[in-house]
């Protein structure tokens, strides 16, 4: 077994949280059946190709997805049994125990209303101040490209700049019942929930979509901060009549004393699944949203989370929920190759490859050491400690060599990265075949932070099972190219493209 949520030694799993999973390394010719002693058991397996491990007897990653009706204070076993083409038998048993159901529930921590006249001005104020702070450009470079960015705003961000808000909006910071990365109960996770103020709304029509916003790097939506692009975006959608749910990643907001589950798709998805269920079951929101249809929107880290949530809802979500739209841009969908590209750059073996071409030691490497590595090394059994991988904020040269030469010590770390890589799914049809969602994907050839091939590979995979709109031109205009040629600073094009993606998503939700 590679990984599981909950971990196998957990004895107090919240019985109200019915979704769980475990992943194993396996040979490709293994057929598997799942069974369990829990009531209402349903299970399926997501298979991924597995690359660059020292072991030659395993070449696939089996992610077993489960749902059960649990009782309190009860032990359970889930069994994955099967045989290879040579009739050799394999079996994996996943065991855990439930405790007493948590008394925690969806709790409103903070709440206020924002007039629609103020909402109309939020994004324009962000462009004039917070955006350039986020870009952190030198004064000389900012002077060169400020006009280019303002021209881009005029051409590509019109819905954000002039949103024509229909309603005042209530902003809520909430906490909810969920789980820590090891599967133990948690009541500390937080989120922002936004919706129109119905008391001042005339002729309001209940919407048939709930909008799930998956935040990008550095955002904490529950802070309800009007300089945070994701808080602003949540207001804009809510001002058009939608119920908007915007979770904080574990490690932000109410759990900010812990490492973030950064790009850990399964754990982020399970937390979000728990949140959505509690919001939609709460009658306080029933006048705003009535139905079972879901739209998921994310960019960068959030774009990765959006695809991960879509996959989780198709494999483990309630049967009556239906994902209708997914918007994902600038995301490391091939997380393994993205990290490998960093290693190749540091090793000097890049040779202009698509995943290492623009790696920058000032910006890209800290994304690995400060954001990606801490969660994977803290919450999963890779056999590695953080100090084995990082020393004085740099990736250890010995670890880089071990990673690129397929040293056995790196096997589980590599496999965990691949468990969060969507481009390695063997069959989109097996996992998304029943979905009616339209998936919008946005890359930029000028993005120095997240390589273009991440999105290209995912589009090629998903189009076999889903309706995919690959917006290749959205962030590849002459304006983006001009900015790309003026500055080599990593993250500038990435950030600007994100705003174009969000502008398009907002345009689709009248």
Predicted regions and their residues:
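Accessory cap/linker subdomain of secreted extracellular hydrolases
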Residues: 127, 131, 139, 328-432
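Short, surface-exposed "cap/lid" segments of acyl-processing enzymes
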Residues: 181-190, 194-240
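Alpha/beta-hydrolase active-site loop
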Residues: 262-285
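Short beta-strand/loop motif that positions the catalytic acidic residue
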Residues: 435, 440-443, 447
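C-terminal catalytic histidine-bearing segment of alpha/beta-hydrolase fold enzymes
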Residues: 456-457, 464-510
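N-terminal non-catalytic regions of secreted/periplasmic and cell-surface proteins
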Residues: 1-37, 77-81, 90-100
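Conserved alpha/beta-hydrolase "acid-adjacent" motif
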Residues: 448-454
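Catalytic-loop region of hydrolases
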Residues: 2-4, 25, 44, 48-50, ...
